[in-house]
Amino acid sequence: MNLTTTMPAAVAPDPPAQLAVSSRSLSDSSDAAGASRTSSSCRASSPSHCPTHAWNPDPPPSSLQPVFSFSPSLPPPCPSPAISSCPPNTLSPPNLLQGIVSQLAMASYIGRLLLYLFQVVPSLLYWAITFTTITVPTALFTLFSMSLTFTMNFTTLLIIVLLLVSTVSWFIRYRFLNIYSRLPPEPQRKEPEIDLFPDSQDGDSKPGLSNYLDEFLSAIKVFGYLERPVFHELTRTMQTRKLIAGETLLLEEEKGFCLVVDGLVQIFVKSIQERDDDRDGWQLDEAVEDSVDEDDEIRRRGHQGYQLLTEVKNGASMSSLFSILSLFSEDIKLRHNEDMESSSSSFNNVPAPDSNPMSPALLLESPTRVSFPDQRDIPTQPSADTLPKVSPLALEGSPGPFEHDPKPRGHRRKRPSRPKRAKSVHPDILARAMVDTTIAIIPASAFRRLTRVYPKATAHIIQVILTRLQRVTFATAHSYLGLTTEVLSIEQQMTKYTSFDLPNHLRGAALDKLKSKFTKEKERLGPEDGTKGIALHNPALNRRRRSSSSLRKDAALHAKLTAVRGKGSASNPIRYGDHESTGVSPGDLLSTIQLSRFGPRYGSERLNGRSVFYDAASGMKTPAGGPPSPLATPGQPLFRFPAQNVTFQRQDSLDQDAIFRESILDCMMKALGLTGSTQDALRKTHNSGDASPHLVSYDSRRQKAVFNNAFGFIDPYDGFGDGDSESLMSMSVTSAGGTSPVHNLRTELQDEIEIVYFPKGSVLIEQGEHNPGLYYVIDGFLDVGIPVNEKGEDLIGSSRRPTAEDILLPITGNASRVSSTLGTAHNQRKKASRRSLYMVKPGGVEGYIGSITSYRSFTDVTAKTDVYVGFLPRAVLERIADRYPLVMLTMAKRLTTVLPRLILHIDFALEWVQVNAGQVIHHQGDESDAIYIVLNGRLRAVLDKGDGKVSVLGEYGQGDSVGELEVMTESTRPGTLHAIRDTELAKFPRTLFNSLAQEHPGITIQISKLIAQRMRHIIDNPLEKGSDKGSPDSAKPTTSTLNLRTVAVLPVTAGIPVVEFGNRLLNAFNQVGVTNGVTSLHQADILNHLGRHAFSKMGKLKLAQYLADLEERYGMVLYVGDTSVNAPWTQTCIAQADCILLVALAEGSPAIGEYERFLLGMKTTARKELVLLHAERYSQPGLTRQWLKNRMWINGGHHHIQMAFRLTAEPVHPETKRLGAVLKQRVQVIQAEIQKYTSRRIRQTPVYSTSTPVKGDFHRLARRLCGKSVGLVLGGGGARGIAHIGVIKALEEAGIPIDIIGGTSIGSFIGALYARDADVVPAYGRAKKFSGRMASMWRFALDLTYPSASYTTGHEFNRGIFKAFGNSHIEDFWLEFYCNTTNISKSRLEFHSSGYAWRYVRASMSLAGLIPPLCDEGNMLLDGGYVDNLTVARMKSLGADVIFAVDVGAIDDNTPQGYGDSLSGFWALVNRWNPFSSLPNPPTLSEIQARLAYVSSVDALERAKSTPGCLYMRPPIDAFGTLDFAKFDEIYQVGYKFGKEFLDRLKNEGGLPIQEETEEKKKLRRTMAPRRASI
């Protein structure tokens, strides 16, 4: 729509005005048209949306002014007369006008921009074209056509060139070649502070206990784990008594278990010389009493002749272990005789002893019963409803035990009619209260009732006490006090109660026939196998190879049915095996003849077509029918037949073997205290078994015995499996059928007895080893003895600290033990002679005490002659003792009878102490009142230096003793002693030591020798424990790996394969060889053994005892934490560990894991080590530092282990897979194995091929934890140190592992190269490259500088070392490494085991004058060889057992000088060049300075040569100089040749620390096989 403006025709504008109007009209027309379109569109769409004003569509023509249409509300028209200032024919509101104006302005800007572009772009294009085509060519043409002439002199030109070269050199030298100086600062890792979380309370007093019951609970721990009913039974009759200060109590008249609730009691014992009236001065020990007035007071009271044994404080027992055994076993018979009938020993009609306590017969036959004036705890009148009927097991009130003994014994009373007061449970013991004291007494009646009601609990308590009696009293007296004769006499005197001869009819021809079988088999085996024990073939063995529990049930039921159906029948049918023969055919293993000869009382045998019964009680044979057999006559020998030729069938031969087995079993059961007279007692035991604690032989599935059978190899232990199921099954059958428990036991054990032949000289039991079982001598003699050099064994001055075996159990002559010491000691050990103690004759039993108590043997038992024995495995004995408590009671009774008086008094004074983790035993500065011997656990002694710093004096594991020096010198404690974990101690009071010193001076001499040996060890090795004073960062972790007994394996976070890691570590332990073996524990093992309530509140006591027994049985226990972080088993692993291995994946996140947080929350002070698992044998530089940076609690170092692992967590107990999944997985495994060998993938990481399995990472870790690490110390000597590489190669070829490396100067360089990859090949290459750089004279010349501090800048030297190590840290090295330096700022020796490797290797190689000192945290470090060039003492302090020390230092010229009292320098110069001079050349100034610098190093070298366990090696490299690096190959060959010769010579001498099995050791192992029950 066009908008036109009407003008009058009369007015005609000029042309320019007309043009302007027209243009404006056009623009206005366009705007109007847009507005019209908007208006029409809005009207079309919606009239309501249109503006209130609009154009008039038909404006009438009027005057000259334009015609407008206004709305009434609009403002007046535009006042401006100019046409351009107001839009024609329209008027907009303010907002509309503003929009129009802004649009017009934008359009104006765009137009101007376009116009500018149209003007500028063409001009730019034009300029560019002209510049490139015209200007530049013109300028170049002009320049090239010019001729310039520069005139300079040579000086100016030289200066310019020098400036240019200097600039380039500076850039390359200081910006490109010194990258090593711009590495981020990584200082040495500061070793963590000692973790000390001790309790405020001390170990003797127990504050916070409010009543006597709490003190009773503390003292009752000696009984071990007690169930609630048993505990209530003991406590319900407990009585208390008040003692005023100074009151004495005659414990000899007390009967019961006494303990101190509150106060202090002194225990006195009668002196041996009490009866000597002519001697005076008997008084209490002044060394114990603090004042003489107290001694005088005691004398005035008439207590002369008594000596102070010990002082008993709160919660401690006044009774000894012996007293407890006496209370339990006071009415048990000592010996069961052969001709004692069961009817004569029946106690069913004997009244309870409580009803008649003063019976003369009772007092007579109960040696430990005492008439007590106070009858509060014993009813004087018979009471039927007070206590239940007395069990026959108590055997109380019976006149039978001694009256029916036809053979006089030494322990019998003279006359049974006169009542005689027997020996008390507290013989010759007197107690005196020092202060007002409250004591508690558990009367003897409580123990008798406990024996009747809970026989199994009683047996369990006795077993615990017997074990502690062995571990505390016997072991201490045997090895610590030197009372070997007294201890070993116990078992010797025990033989009079355990010796039972075989019946006469088993002598003569029967025995000869038995021997002939072994003779034939020995001839068949040959001389080599003849050194082993040969076991007689057991036909029932094939039955026992099946499931034991079902077969036991079948056997018991079959015996029962046989007894019911045919007591008097002839014989049962005989079942033959796969074939039969008509004679004794050695090698016939397939005979499975089943002889049904077990009845309720008799065993029937098929002999020559007749049925003969063997009476188990009397040992006589009677025929089933017909005329009497000659076998029934005692005088006739067995197997004597009529004159006609009688041929034995194979069945008859087996019957003879069965006769021997039955007779041997009868004798063994009598020796154990099980006879037909105890049938009712045993039945009572079975019936009460459910209410008693159930003990399981945890050793039954591990102790495997393999016999060399006369007819093949058999495994007698395959039969039993789980002893619990067998016990319960036989119990149920017995109780159901009413058959004699003894007979059922005999039936079960019939197949367990083995008849074994040992040739002369065979070792049946070895000292220090657990007894394999019980031996009954059929024919021959056994020799029991000890090595004669046992006392002289160097307990301390060996190459290692004393372990449990050294102090408590010196295992001298243990040929089977893999020794890690040198060959000389091994040869002396093999040549050690032995001293015979006594002989075991036919009918005697050996291994009685050790087999039942499961403790190590104090003696070794050998065959004096060719000997035939019956053998019952230890696991079977443990099962018998578990099911029949009378076995333990009988042993307890016999022990209390034969115990020497001296051992008894030691037992009274020795205190069994149990301390919790972190508890302080004594503080620094306390009075030395006792010696502590560690039975179980770990202690740490720390010294408070006063400035807030604490240092460790030592750690003490199982068998170590603490405090002898302080006790003997009566000095104060040098440090604070606290328990790292829950610990059991034997407290040896000073009062006992003083008492024994008066009556037994030999004990004082023994302990004096021990202290002297320790002092000599400290003097000879002053630096072994790291006592060399260095900087804090140079100190090694304060804990020690010596004598570790428990190791826990914990993951850092979930998903780490700790189970697989634990299994591999266990295998490595077994191959390395741990004394007494090693075992691993998982949660499943604990639950299988102790049940699902093992971690309950009550079950923890039982668990603690079980774990303590395991630690006693094995040399190392490995706890694998395979549960969640909050599981009880995880807490148990941490609490029981001497050392904790935190396993982490090296490529994982180094953040703190949840297991570590839990570990820190428990505040354990055990040693903690970090184990990083790598998929490949390579550690990235700086990776280890990331792991250790935030873990200051890692105080035991770290280990790099290569192990292939899965990224996803593998379940501990994987679910059973289907067959298809299993096959698929198997195929995938096979494919992966094939690809492993067919793929040609190039490894980018170093390859380490171990020539022997002992060089693996797990073996290295196992040796580290066992204290058997092999260390390599490399000395300094410049270029002569290249020989180190040859020696290392010789060590690798000899199969000697290297676990720790230490070096000085060039030794630190070579050692670091080898420790980085644990491979000699890359070390050789990098060392040769470095030698090439050092041999370059140009590099040396370019590095020269003004000799203010040194002749060179050290840059080329730094470059050569940095190119060898890069930015690797010492922590990244695969093997543990350290180097030493001399800190001239603080004048001390420092050791470095962390930080950049190149820096500290360079510092250790910094020769003064040639290279400037290295600045490290403000200190100047120089060559470590100035103080110690061969750091053997440092290596020894790290726990290395065997050390190879290679010395390549220069030898000083020691030619005597004679130039006089003054010296002219001119004469010295002339004399040096005078060939005719006879005087030696005096040293130069530099030589004097060098010798002065190495003065302390020479002394350290001499000490290193004499260090025990150090193998000193010095290759012949004296012909080479310090800087002869150009002769690399020659020096390397010299070292390699020397190493080969040295190791070959050492191998021939038997001194190599490797586990090689020579032919001699193989024969020795075969000879020693019987002691491990491998007969």
From Swiss-Prot:
Gene3D superfamilies: Cytosolic phospholipase A2 catalytic domain (3.40.1090.10), Jelly Rolls (2.60.120.10)
Known regulation of activity: Inhibited by organophosphorus esters.
Membrane topology listed for this record: Multi-pass membrane protein
A Pfam family this chain is assigned to: cNMP_binding
Localisation: Endoplasmic reticulum membrane
Motif GXGXXG location, chain numbering: 1276-1281
Keyword ATP-binding: no
Motif DGA/G, residue numbers: 1423-1425
Stretches of the chain found on the membrane's Lumenal side: 121-151
Bridged cysteine pairs (disulfide): none
Renumbered residue ranges of the record's region Disordered: 1-56, 339-425, 568-587
Xref: SUPFAM superfamilies: cAMP-binding domain-like, FabD/lysophospholipase-like
Residue ranges of every copy of the PNPLA domain listed in the record: 1272-1436
EC top class, as a word: hydrolase
Keyword annotations from UniProtKB, A to Z: Endoplasmic reticulum, Hydrolase, Lipid degradation, Lipid metabolism, Membrane, Repeat, Transmembrane, Transmembrane helix
InterPro entries: Acyl_Trfase/lysoPLipase, cNMP-bd_dom, cNMP-bd_dom_sf, LysoPLipase_patatin_CS, NTE, NTE1_P-loop_dom, PNPLA_dom, RmlC-like_jellyroll
Motif (GXSXG): 1303-1307
Biased composition range(s): Basic residues: 409-424
Residues given in the record as a nucleoside 3',5'-cyclic phosphate 2 binding sites: 894-1014
EC number: 3.1.1.5
Molecular-function GO term, any one: lysophospholipase activity
Positions in the Cytoplasmic compartment: 1-99, 173-1575
Biased composition (Low complexity): 19-48
Protein role: Intracellular phospholipase B that catalyzes the double deacylation of phosphatidylcholine (PC) to glycerophosphocholine (GroPCho). Plays an important role in membrane lipid homeostasis. Responsible for the rapid PC turnover in response to inositol, elevated temperatures, or when choline is present in the growth medium.
Family membership noted in the UniProt record: Belongs to the NTE family.
The protein's name in its UniProt record: Lysophospholipase NTE1
Annotated organism of origin: Coccidioides immitis (strain RS)
Gene: NTE1
